[in-house]
A protein has these predicted regions:
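Alpha-helical segment proximal to the catalytic Tyr-Lys
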Residues: 126, 173-177, 239
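Short C-terminal tail/terminal secondary-structure segment
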Residues: 231, 242-258
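Short, flexible catalytic-loop segment of classical short-chain dehydrogenase/reductase
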Residues: 187-197, 254
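Conserved glycine-rich cofactor-binding loop
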Residues: 16-18
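Active-site helix of classical SDR
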Residues: 113, 121, 160, 168
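Substrate-binding pocket helix/loop in short-chain dehydrogenase/reductase
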Residues: 98-99, 105-109, 207, 211
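Conserved NAD(P)H cofactor-binding loop of Rossmann-fold oxidoreductase domains
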Residues: 90-96, 251
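Residue(s) in the substrate-gating loop at a strand-loop-helix junction
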Residues: 142
Length: 258
């Protein structure tokens, strides 16, 4: 354990499982405090207990697909957490579907997450700028924002994540002079609970294993694989890194084995 995040408060939007949860664990382990945003109270409480550091953890429960949920997060941040200096935007949904089968509710689902991400980030940044707080933001993007995969048709998801990549670069330019770094990571297939939304839970392990050869490194990613890189980008060790979109993908974007 080190104290590399001592005195720093991290907000993780989508922090009750997967990549966001593991990032929170690393920041807590290294001296920081954490605010987790999740859409289910039972899951948020389970995450708090699993992290076993109640005095350093706050939770905000909100449905980010609804405007009132987004507003609740923003209001809570402004009332109780104006000292946030680190932000990870990890909220997301993933439902592969052919383009011609999409309806407006699918589109709205993805865009609602982007809307919440945009305006929560806006208020965190406002507070940081007003208080002269320097810090770091990391957005969880996606390989699907950079290339299409025939086995998982993801036009709506890809459009949403491509927007997040673009937001990353724009904010890096706007906020660099204020001491706020903004980066994104672009993972390939990572074994997280998100796949249980469209694959029977008992089948997920086999499906993940079937994707191993898709990655030149020979396996799918884990939430810890991603969290280690996210925590690195949050830390002072990457003080000269901003506007970057890092491929954390087991080599997928480098090319193909065959």
């Amino acid at each position: 354990m080190s104290a590399s995040f001592a005195g720093k408060k991290l907000l993780v939007v989508g922090g009750t499982s997967g990549m966001g949860f593991e990032t929170a664990r690393l920041v807590l382990k290294n001296g920081g405090s954490v605010v987790l945003v999740g859409n289910r109270r039972d899951k948020a409480e389970q995450a708090r207990q699993a992290l076993a550091a109640d005095s350093q953890i706050s939770i905000i429960v909100a449905d980010l697909m609804k405007e009132e949920g987004m507003k609740h997060v923003v209001d809570t941040i402004n009332a109780e957490h104006k000292d946030i200096s680190l932000l990870v935007n990890a909220a997301g949904v993933f439902f592969p579907k052919p383009f011609t089968e999409h309806d407006t509710s699918d589109y709205d689902m993805y865009m609602s997450i982007n809307r919440a991400t945009f305006f929560i980030t806006r208020d965190v940044v406002r507070n940081m700028v007003d208080a002269g707080i320097k810090g770091s933001i990391v957005n969880i993007g996606s390989m699907w924002a950079q290339q299409a995969i025939g086995a998982t048709p993801s036009s709506a998801y890809s459009m949403a994540k491509a927007g997040l990549h673009a937001l990353t670069k724009n904010l890096a330019i706007e906020l660099g002079g204020k001491g706020i770094r903004v980066n994104a990571i672009s993972p390939a297939v990572v074994h997280t609970p998100i796949y249980e939304s469209f694959i029977p839970k008992d089948d997920v392990e086999d499906v993940m294993n079937s994707f191993g050869s898709f990655h030149p490194i020979g396996r799918v990613g884990t939430p810890v694989d991603i969290a280690e890189t996210v925590a690195f980008l949050l830390s002072d060790k990457t003080d000269w890194v901003t506007g970057a979109i890092w491929d954390i993908d087991g080599g997928v974007m480098a090319g193909r084995n065959a």
